[in-house]
Regions:
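Charged interaction scaffolds used for protein-protein
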Residues: 1-13, 21-88
């Protein structure tokens, strides 16, 4: 599963899973706002995806611009799911 880890300007970190809902919302937002496709707006799209994932998970109630003012960095990571219990 993919997760996004946010490092805020105050030094704290938070992470959440990138859900299909967040991916679709970020894509739709980019299309509606005529952001350049692909690598031409990759950074903005990455930060917006992180914002949507955090908002959907209940980690922020701020708008995108206000949230961006609090962010130091984002990192996308791949985490393997917990292995299933073979005794179940």
């Amino acid at each position: 599963m993919q997760i996004v880890k946010i490092t805020y300007a105050d030094g704290r970190t938070e992470e959440t899973r990138l859900t299909p809902r967040a991916l679709c919302q970020a894509e739709e937002h980019a299309q509606i706002n005529n952001w350049a496709a692909g690598d031409a707006s990759r950074i903005r799209q990455s930060y917006y995806l992180a914002f949507i994932a955090m908002r959907n998970a209940g980690h922020t109630t701020l708008g995108f611009d206000e949230w961006m003012d609090t962010v130091e960095d984002i990192a996308l990571e791949q985490k393997d799911p917990e292995p299933a219990n073979p005794t179940l």
